[in-house]
């Protein structure tokens, strides 16, 4: 039996709220019953976004939809599920990604293109779309500007611990807050090609 563990990694630091960003997580039972597996990050109107995606031509449905949506609209929400990557799922996977965006958009009162989907987990299996959609009210009910640590837990799959960083800096008399959360990075090699 192999035992994997994080070595010499610090615990999750305090993650400062970012004005205009609210986060909510829930246990939607997408793959496992006892873990946070659905995250919604709501962005205030006018939020600017940038993204880096895989260079691989064969990419998951959420990557295709996210690229498309970021090219069409300013994001109002990021929708992140763990458990199933919605990769290698063909047109059904595309439909699932689009339907999940439409479901959240209907609740938020925005265009479906303003919702950017992200999925991580097992490849080759479809999302349990009804469980994902049923979990959306739980995420929205848990929304807060301080939900960063919970969101860091909510995006984990095989990660051994949540990862995030936060800094406040003063620039020309204004305090700027930069906060981010991340997953493990092993799957991005070589050169963003997975």
Residue ranges and their predicted role:
Residues 2-54, 58:
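N-terminal amphipathic/basic leader segments beginning at the initiator methionine
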Residues 14, 18, 77, 82-84, ...:
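N-terminal hydrophobic or amphipathic segments with adjacent small-residue motifs
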Residues 15, 30-32, 55-57, 72, ...:
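A generic structural signal for short, solvent-exposed coil/turn residues
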Residues 19, 23, 82, 89, ...:
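Short glycine-rich loop/turn motifs that provide flexible caps or phosphate-binding loops at active sites
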Residues 21, 38, 61, 78, ...:
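A broad, low-specificity signal marking well-ordered, structured residues that form hydrophobic/aromatic
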Residues 23-25, 32, 54-55, 65-67, ...:
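Generic structural "secondary-structure junction" signal
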Residues 41-97, 107, 187-194:
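Glycine-rich phosphate/pyrophosphate-binding loop regions near the starts of catalytic domains
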Residues 98-194:
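Glycine-rich, mobile lid/loop segments that gate access to catalytic sites or pores
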């Amino acid at each position: 039996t192999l035992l994997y563990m994080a070595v010499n990694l610090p615990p999750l630091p305090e993650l400062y709220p970012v004005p205009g960003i609210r986060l909510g997580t829930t246990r939607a039972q997408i793959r496992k019953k006892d873990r946070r597996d659905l995250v919604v990050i709501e962005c205030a109107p006018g939020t600017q976004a940038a993204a880096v995606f895989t260079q691989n031509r064969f990419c998951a449905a959420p990557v295709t939809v996210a690229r498309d949506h970021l090219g069409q609209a300013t994001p109002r929400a990021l929708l992140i599920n763990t458990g199933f990557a919605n990769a290698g799922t063909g047109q059904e996977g595309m439909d699932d990604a689009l339907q999940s965006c439409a479901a959240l958009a209907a609740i938020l009162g925005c265009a479906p293109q303003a919702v950017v989907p992200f999925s991580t987990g097992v490849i080759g299996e479809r999302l349990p779309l009804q469980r994902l959609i049923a979990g959306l009210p739980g995420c929205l009910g848990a929304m807060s500007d301080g939900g960063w640590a919970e969101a860091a837990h909510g995006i984990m799959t095989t990660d051994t611990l949540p990862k995030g960083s936060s800094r406040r800096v003063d620039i020309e008399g204004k305090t700027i807050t930069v906060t981010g959360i991340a997953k493990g990075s092993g799957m991005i090699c070589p050169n963003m090609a997975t």
